[in-house]
Amino acid sequence: FKSGIVVCQNAGLAFSSGFGCEITSEIPIRAGTSSSSAISVSWIHFLSRIADVPAGWDQRKIGELAYKTEVEEFNEPGGMMDQYSTAMGHLIYLQSEPDIAIQSLNPNLGPFVLGDSCEPKDTMFILSRCRDARLEIMEKLKVRNPNLYIHSSGDDLDLTDLTENEKSLFMATIKNRNLLKSALIELEKDELNHDIIGNLLTDHHTVLRDILNVSTPKIETMMDAALNAGALGGKING
């Protein structure tokens, strides 16, 4: 909460008096459902309205400041999709480099079932492990592939300097990138194919489980039960 006030002050807001707040939420905590981002976005929005001179920030600006509040202020690992998705609402495609670009999508996805395994996860550890390993891999690859660009690089890269473990992690990154591109193509259609979206979700989960090791036996049991009950696909959140 203090970081949110600091971020808002850096953005030009001033607060000449204090205030008392009570927060209630039904979002599961530490369950991959963006509970912290929901609080950050709501907090920034509240601060923008309660300031001495209220700010008329739009949803994108609130998402940007929520990201700074949660990630940049603490130098934590993590992307910005949770903050922008929560602030913008509905479904978005977010591209974070070379510049931030947000595309609002409005597909007819139908119902989703969100299951809570009630197993707490160490989000920061998972994100840090994956981020640090990827950064090291990218630095190694640039030695033999000076024009490396993760958004378009293909099978022509020289992976000689990578260990087998690093090759697996890099290929997982490429697979996830390709799954995202395939999903975007489908989601932009007037009539999307729900079976394709379901398969893409499951394929993504397979990468997360088998290569990034972020699933658990209980979540796998829940996934199997959902698929056996007729779900078109599914994946772990967070």
Features from the language model and the residues they span:
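C-terminal nucleotide
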Residues: 85, 90-235
